[in-house]
């Protein structure tokens, strides 16, 4: 099974991806996480350091694939999760999609691409150009990370459009949304009414999720020394269980931009009179990790 994780920049995709990878490993699956971001920090909380990228390794070998060994590019992370960082082209030059393609090509050359039960692509930001939509070419499912905010749901809608487009020629489905670190979910619910799709989980506003990224540890590793964190891990285990159930998923039909703008803005501008005095309710939730 291959999964591509997308979402608005800064929404917490890498933190969420790493914890989902661990949760899948806890369910007995062999997992490979591929970071698809020039920052090459997707797997930081799994390995504890910035691992060398595929592109760096290929450059050091003058792009002689036959000189590259699995241990040159695949690093063992916490919980037995294997980690790869694709890297990216120089800033302002090249195409990220090409880098993803080279990564998959190399892993196939190493006979590693098909050795895993689950491969998870963690893709940068909400960029859905042909290049950074490339992981969707290899994925069975897409997961969108969002929060209860206006901008994050706009990004989710654009990603949903990319999934629909790719599904025309690939057996790709949207597994669903994951709400990350949000105190409310009313806007998420409003969106999925207009664009039906599963909501796999909504993680509450837990500071330790943000702190885990700074510490370079997953929530599962933090829970080893602080068992009070186990309840947070249960959220990710629930997501893993839904993924492994191999649900049918959906081919989403995105909401037109102007219609979505009206839908989301009207929801806050026209609150019921009983709640108009509650300033907290009227504020958009823009909290991110």
Swiss-Prot record:
Note describing how the cofactor binds: Binds 1 [4Fe-4S] cluster per dimer.
GO biological process: light-independent chlorophyll biosynthetic process; photosynthesis, dark reaction
PROSITE patterns the UniProt entry points to: NIFH_FRXC_1 (PS00746), NIFH_FRXC_2 (PS00692), NIFH_FRXC_3 (PS51026)
Principal location: plastid
Known catalytic reactions: chlorophyllide a + oxidized 2[4Fe-4S]-[ferredoxin] + 2 ADP + 2 phosphate = protochlorophyllide a + reduced 2[4Fe-4S]-[ferredoxin] + 2 ATP + 2 H2O
Binding site for Mg(2+): 14
A molecular-function term among this protein's GO annotations: oxidoreductase activity, acting on iron-sulfur proteins as donors
Pathway entry: Porphyrin-containing compound metabolism; chlorophyll biosynthesis (light-independent)
UniProt keyword terms in alphabetical order: 4Fe-4S, ATP-binding, Chlorophyll biosynthesis, Chloroplast, Iron, Iron-sulfur, Magnesium, Metal-binding, Nucleotide-binding, Oxidoreductase, Photosynthesis, Plastid
InterPro entries referenced in this protein's UniProt entry, alphabetically: NifH/chlL_CS (IPR030655), NifH/frxC (IPR000392), P-loop_NTPase (IPR027417), Protochlorophyllide_ATP-bd (IPR005971)
Positions annotated to bind ATP: 10-15, 39, 180-181
Cofactors, names only: [4Fe-4S] cluster
Self-association and partners: Homodimer. Protochlorophyllide reductase is composed of three subunits; ChlL, ChlN and ChlB.
Pfam families (UniProt xref): Fer4_NifH (PF00142)
Function, in words: Component of the dark-operative protochlorophyllide reductase (DPOR) that uses Mg-ATP and reduced ferredoxin to reduce ring D of protochlorophyllide (Pchlide) to form chlorophyllide a (Chlide). This reaction is light-independent. The L component serves as a unique electron donor to the NB-component of the complex, and binds Mg-ATP.
Protein name: Light-independent protochlorophyllide reductase iron-sulfur ATP-binding protein
Residues annotated as binding [4Fe-4S] cluster: 95, 129
Compartment annotation: Plastid, Chloroplast
Recorded family membership: Belongs to the NifH/BchL/ChlL family.
EC number: 1.3.7.7
HAMAP family named among the record's database cross-references: ChlL_BchL
